[in-house]
Amino acid sequence: MITVNEGSVTIRVPDFSKVSARAPVFYNPAMEFNRDVSVVALQVFQRLLGGEISVADTFSGSGIRAIRYLVEVEGVSEAFANDINPLAVECIKNNSVINSVSPEVSREDASIFLRSNHGRFDVIDIDPFGTPAPFMDSAAASARNNSLLAVTATDTSSLCGTYIKPCLRKYSSRPLKTEYCHETGLRILAGFTAMNLARYRKAASVLLSHSSQHYMRLYIRVRRGARRADESIRNIGFMLHCFRCLHHEHVNGFAPLKRECPHCGAEMDVAGPLWVGDIQDSKFIGEMIGEVENKELNTAGDVLKLLKGCLDEAGMPPGFYDIHEVCSKLGRSAPPLRDVMDGLEAAGFRVSRTHIRPTGIRTDAGIGEIEEVLAGLMPE
């Protein structure tokens, strides 16, 4: 056994040489950053609701997430730590004693656990090893009004378009391997979640989304009501991408046809259905930024960097342009990113960086306007 200190808690887990779903008890040290962000997000959400909240950790493993929520998030009155692995259940109980907390510990399949506790939780956290897709229907059915659904997906090769058929099977959506494929993956996951919620007359609004390391993470507020659900799914649509000139655009609705690129005339490829609405909530993220300094986080600097990047992206159109990719298509060397952004702003366009790729920019300018700015910065 080894001792792990994370946030304000200490746990003991079996020694491991490689993170794997086959490990006796699943604990991934690389996900500390994920859990740090989650602690901050839950604190802000708790204050948004006011009063005490109940939290479900559906794939608890060592219990680290549920225990941290109890210890570090003010207002968490109860936390449920569930895992189907009997060794994990014993580990959760032992780690709870170490930290002087008492989560409700259960050993059930995640879907059964959620359905047997219908409407009980203010926060449902789904952080499996792999895809969350098989559990999303149960999560959608169980989510109470005005609750938070926090979802992790580590099957990024499917969501990003390396393997198209698995994404079609799991998420009923076609991915596309572009420079912004990680954003497309986030939007596929958000759209899939929203459609699952809509079946139960519940609406989704994305508070925060990020693609980090080997996973994608969403924080979605759930509201009940058929009218709200109808409004929510108006954010479902498709991304269209031209691989010849890198033009991209999005359309709302469920039946787009491949069409001619308005910039170069080539046929565009399609990704979706997916979420084309906002994937960052500026107010929620702003409050998270203010909360970071109140928490004991080993990755506080990285958390702040991520949140500030996500805040910059709020309200910007779907997709982004990798300036190095654009310049490569043009056969030119890339100028400093700041110069490109300044040029676009001077031309009257909105522009921001993206947390997903350091050489990417978000803007409401089209590829033609970007090429004009680049031409001014890099004369022949």
UniProtKB/Swiss-Prot annotation:
Molecular function, one GO term: tRNA binding
Positions annotated to bind Zn(2+): C242, C245, C261, C264
Pfam family, one: TRM
Keyword flag Membrane: no
Family named by the database record: Belongs to the class I-like SAM-binding methyltransferase superfamily. Trm1 family.
Entry protein name: tRNA (guanine(26)-N(2))-dimethyltransferase
InterPro entries: SAM-dependent_MTases_sf, Trm1, TRM1_arc_bac, tRNA_met_Trm1_C
Occurrences of domain Trm1 methyltransferase (ranges): 2-374
The EC number(s) this enzyme carries: 2.1.1.216
Native organism: Methanothermobacter thermautotrophicus (strain ATCC 29096 / DSM 1053 / JCM 10044 / NBRC 100330 / Delta H) (Methanobacterium thermoautotrophicum)
BP GO terms, sorted: tRNA N2-guanine methylation
Keywords: Metal-binding, Methyltransferase, RNA-binding, S-adenosyl-L-methionine, Transferase, tRNA processing, tRNA-binding, Zinc
Function: Dimethylates a single guanine residue at position 26 of a number of tRNAs using S-adenosyl-L-methionine as donor of the methyl groups.
Catalytic activity: guanosine(26) in tRNA + 2 S-adenosyl-L-methionine = N(2)-dimethylguanosine(26) in tRNA + 2 S-adenosyl-L-homocysteine + 2 H(+)
